[in-house]
A protein has these predicted regions:
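Non-catalytic structural scaffold of enzyme domains
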Residues: 1-168
């Protein structure tokens, strides 16, 4: 969810790194391209050429700066995963696949996985495909509840506010 997701990711890397001094932390290059066009809009309209070019340029920039792999903290951007991966020689971590794999391996006999995401992510079915590939049933919110999820993401979190938990 924009800069918030990047911040959360970085905080988690720090929290899970065993380090007693600065030099023991993981070297990272952070790229927050806040002016990136809206991914959901690009998926819905099919007008995605400019967005794909920007995503691939960012990936090549990270590679040039010495990154050994790339983590994209935006679920919706993973709709363009193949384009991004094809633009670089280093691995791009597929957050969708990793998330589904985590759920399947973390919880014994999991049969269903709930998906709360933008309309672009839901509409693209990227989580649905990963769930089915892993042998679990994807579950998405009703249209009414999906509107609440979108409001939480766009009106709250992307606007720099803390999420309204009452919407859930």
């Amino acid at each position: 969810m924009g800069p918030e997701a990047s911040c959360y990711f970085y905080e988690n890397v720090i929290a899970h790194t065993k380090a007693e001094k600065d030099q023991e932390h993981i070297d990272m290059v952070l790229l927050s391209h806040a002016s990136m066009p809206d991914r959901t809009k690009a998926i819905r309209t099919g007008d995605d050429t400019h967005l794909i070019n920007l995503l691939c340029t960012d990936a090549r920039t990270l590679e040039t700066l010495g990154a050994s792999n790339i983590a994209i903290t935006c679920n919706t951007s993973h709709y363009f995963y193949k384009h991004i991966q094809n633009a670089v020689k280093i691995p791009v971590i597929n957050m969708i696949q990793e998330s589904v794999n985590y759920a399947v391996h973390k919880y014994d006999n999991v049969k269903r996985v709930g998906i709360m995401a933008t309309d672009g992510t839901i509409g693209s079915k990227i989580y649905h495909k990963a769930c089915r590939k892993a042998g679990v049933t994807p579950v998405q919110p009703s249209e009414e509840r999906q509107a609440d999820v979108m409001s939480l993401i766009y009106d709250d979190i992307k606007a720099g506010k803390s999420g309204d938990r009452a919407k859930f």
